[in-house]
Amino acid sequence: MPNRQAASAPVLARGQGVVYRELPCRSLLNRSTSRRMPFTWTINPYRGCEFGCRYCYARYTHEFMGLEDPHLFETEIFAKTNASDALARDLARLKDPGSGIAMGTATDPYQPAERKALVTRGILELLARSEDARGIRFSITTKSDLVTRDLDVLREIGHRMRLSVNITITTLNRRLSRILEPRAPRPGRRLLAVKALAEAGIRTGVFIMPVLPGITDRPASLEAIASAASRAGASTIAHQVLFLMSSAKRSFYPFLSERFPRLLAGYRRTYALSAYNTAAYRKRIDLLMESLRKRYDLDGRSDPDRAPGRRPDLQMSLAFRE
């Protein structure tokens, strides 16, 4: 959708500095571009995300619509209002589900728009009744406790599909969370969502993604998340060190300059030639997280459908143009 069409898309509602628009889609399933991913297909009910996470890697997806300013990713939200119909068509002709479907890879399916738009709810209701979806692995990733609104339909899906729900928690520090993820629910509310999902019998994991060097990577901080996740009933934790593409630097570096100026030079050096942190740093975090998984029984050994640990190149699966 070029810029002119994006600007003329029907307005569904307006919020404080946010415009919600309608975006019909011909297809909802998008094939992952990376063979290393633990899923083959992705679903993103929205384009853009109001949570405004400072490290967000998906801002570049608005560029496909001619919206070049990274800030527009959190202020121009497009709802795929015919998503369930599009998904029904996709599933009917899906010959190979591969390693399954992941929802929420380039937007949060439970961002504020979902309270009224109900796009995610419609998708879940379709999956709960679709014979074409039976037996497929399906995962949801979110930072929002709004997911508990849909416990009824998630239970139904759990009887038909291999369902897991992952709650992303990057820090338990409320103040730091407000700085990094200004409009996302606080960490305590996310932990309550983990507890509610687990008590409902839904396989539930916690994603520590991304681990931010010098900001959220203290061993005590990571252990606090692991301990809290275990107490809440999570079966796994997974992590990923910040993967910083050039497009994300446009908004992330100014943020660092304002809030963490002493770290900016180090980030520039580390990510100058690659979107990855150094192998030595990633190995150190991997070893720490592996020890925490064992210590808090979060390795998913009793759950064959889960793949705990480091999630390789998650951001690389996000190229989509539907």
Please report, for each region that a protein language model flagged, where it lies by residue:
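Auxiliary Fe-S-binding modules of radical SAM enzymes
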Residues: 1-24, 28-31, 217-322
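Conserved Radical SAM active-site core
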Residues: 3, 7, 11-46, 51-166, ...
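Short histidine/acidic/glycine/proline-rich micro-motifs that form metal-
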Residues: 108-110, 211-214, 275-276
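Conserved strand-turn element in the central/C-terminal portion of the radical SAM core barrel
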Residues: 140, 172-176, 181-183, 196-218, ...
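Active-site glycine- and acidic-residue-rich loops that bind
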Residues: 145-148, 212-223
